[in-house]
């Protein structure tokens, strides 16, 4: 049986079976992971940050995502674990001197090498193109190849000298097993931080209660001191309270205050043990006193009066 024109159809043209799964080009996948932002799908440009699962982002895209409070904001696997800017780390990348960028093939007549990367490992010199495993330190943000960390075993960063632990090493764009391990570490780290916050709160409450108890214990002593002061007033206050009564008794009915007696304040020089020459200076001495005959009359007799 044939069709018009004498052609004979084959079985696969008539019977439709299940579609084959399309295979993703590995080179294209690596280029997308290492050269484009996971959130905005734009070309990576500095400052570049990485999350706790090892995915690469543009810092501007992460900030815009966190500031966006609208209900239409897309929440996917790439952003569900990012709750604040503290959940990402800014990377310290080393530039590749052989990288020419878009300037190398402006005419389109040359082969575009997709394996050429913008950044390299500062220790070994491997290019960060996805062919080699790279990781970064969460404490300082320095990026190295996994080979460099294995060959040069140290507990200090090779670039800045910061101390780190094994938990601080995060693999960039790792496999599914790597992502699951990093996710488990992230959850443990966040749970530990919550427990530390809860333990700090009771300590502050206990310190506040201790301060309150100390203030309460200091209160009765002050009250007792106040009662003793009221019961036993200062004798100086007694004298000062008695003084106005005396002045009031010396005062007249019109409200004027009388002068206090000054006899007690006066002091005679005759009672002192000084010499007679010293005593003769003062008017209280006997030599300074005159009789009525020697004293002058208040009316002066002069030649002008006659």
Curated annotation (Swiss-Prot):
GO molecular function: DNA binding
Localization annotation: Chromosome
InterPro entries: Rtf2, Rtf2_RING-finger
Record's compositionally biased regions (Basic and acidic residues): 226-240
Gene Ontology annotations of biological process type: cellular response to hydroxyurea; mitotic DNA replication termination; regulation of DNA stability
Chief place of localization: nucleus
Segments for region (Disordered): 192-306
Domain of life: Eukaryota
GO cellular component: nucleus; replication fork
Pfam families attached to this UniProt entry: Rtf2
Signal sequence annotation: none
Keyword Phosphoprotein carried by entry: yes
Post-translational modification (record): Undergoes proteasomal degradation, via DDI1 and DDI2. Removal from stalled replisomes and degradation are required for genome stability.
Keywords: Chromosome, Phosphoprotein
Residue numbers of Phosphoserine PTMs: 287
Stretches assigned to coiled coil: none
Job of this protein: Replication termination factor which is a component of the elongating replisome. Required for ATR pathway signaling upon DNA damage and has a positive activity during DNA replication. Might function to facilitate fork pausing at replication fork barriers like the rDNA. May be globally required to stimulate ATR signaling after the fork stalls or encounters a lesion. Interacts with nascent DNA.
Record-stated family: Belongs to the rtf2 family.
Subunit structure: Interacts with DDI2; probably also interacts with DDI1.
Protein name: Replication termination factor 2
Organism: Rattus norvegicus (Rat)
Gene behind the chain: Rtf2
